[in-house]
Amino acid sequence: MLDPAQAKTIIAEELERLRERIIANMRAQNAVASGRTIKSLRVVMTADGGALVSDQQMPFGVLETGRRGGRIPYGFSAIIYQWMQDNGVHATVIPYKTNRPHKYTEQERSDRSMASAIAHTIARSGSRLYRTGGRDTIYSNVIPETVERIENRITGMMSAYVDEMIPINNTEIGGK
């Protein structure tokens, strides 16, 4: 008999496989900044099917298209600065010209200045990925394969069900 639970299991398995492939592609393309997007990817099953969703506020498409220029969130340079600290990226030191006490060390001042410059460039022109035309190697290449695999598995399940229900070789139903 045709089992809807089996179809949902197939969908859940394929969506989990899709999630794993997207994560592998993100790592292979060096598209992991903080790891929050990877942690937020999850498979959600409903009564009608399922979906792969991200809890991040940023649109998921930015992973392939990049961020266009325009308005940036408040504190964007602080976000970039934190990313720089997390990944060990540092600017060339800009020495102070006075000997008075300063709020930041020379390195921290240089890093904050670099983060502000990067934020300004992204706000004005967009990210480098956006300026170079984006890519299609994170999820665009694996979604069609996943849809095809789901179709093939569900179709196989349906054809097995139909084979059970339809008499073969002109045999009558009920054994007559």
Predicted segments with their positions:
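Charge-rich, low-complexity N-terminal segments
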Residues: 1-51
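Charged, low-complexity interaction tracts
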Residues: 36-176
